[in-house]
Amino acid sequence: MNSAATETTKRIVCVDQLRGYAIFGMLLVNAKGLFFEPVESYLKGSNFLAAFEAFTYQISHHQENFTYADTIAPLFVFVVGMGMRLSWLRRGRNASPAENRKALVKRYFMLVLIGFAIYSGWLWDALTDIGLAGLLAIPLIDKKPRTRILAAFAFVIAYQCIHSFTSYGQWSMHGGKFSATDPEYIPLLVRLVPLHDALFQVPLNGGPLGPMSWVMMLLFGTLAYDLLAAKNENKFI
């Protein structure tokens, strides 16, 4: 294998390490119910109980406060963005932009399909969100950094406006109900969506519009890869 081919295919250690840490964090956060709850009953009355409760609080999600658990999914999506940009640049050496985009669409659409297949009743979990966020990012993957930054903020601002000024926020934050006073109320726009009963069944990770916020971290990941590839450590930090 010649040096050019090696340069094209070699792993980037720091990206792999960051991805590995994110996966470890996901395992830790999702292991609470399986491993840590039995330990809590064992430690009752012990001097270690308070420290253990503080630990389990940090690996749990809460409606209020920001914990360690809340850092893991955004970090993983960030790393996905780094990998997406790397894949675009490497594939672009031998493929046209149209072919490159087609390959990315296929990859992220497959993630969405796999997510829909395995998350029955919990559609908006990790794979689905990553797939949809990736699809949103594909038109922007080759744009200038400034364009990607503006698009990232535009997506998250649009999502926050919908969340704050429509009944979507009520649905997302309060158990899947669009109205606090009328549990049966469903907005007209939602009723017009095919299969809305399934799509709006669980308000997980922001629901159907959640990828509008997740794509911000993914696009920031593409920017981080550009800085890393430029080997400018001061800028990267």
Where are these regions (language model features)?
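Specific transmembrane alpha-helix
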Residues: A73-L89, L127-P139, P208-A230
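N-terminal signal-anchor module of multipass membrane proteins
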Residues: N2-S96, N100
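Transmembrane helix-loop junctions in multipass membrane proteins, especially transporters and channels
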Residues: P38-Y42, R90-G92, S164, Y168-S172, ...
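Active-site-adjacent structural elements in folded domains
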Residues: S120-L123, V202-L209, K235-F236
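Hydrophobic transmembrane-helix microenvironments that flank and shape a buried ionizable site
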Residues: V13-D16, L27, T67, L104, ...
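Transmembrane alpha-helical segments and their boundary/interface "anchor" motifs
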Residues: D70-L75, W88-Y119, L123, L127-A137, ...
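Long hydrophobic alpha-helical segments that form multi-pass transmembrane helix bundles
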Residues: R146-A229
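Active-site-adjacent bridging/hinge elements
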Residues: F48-Y57, L111-G115, L188-D197
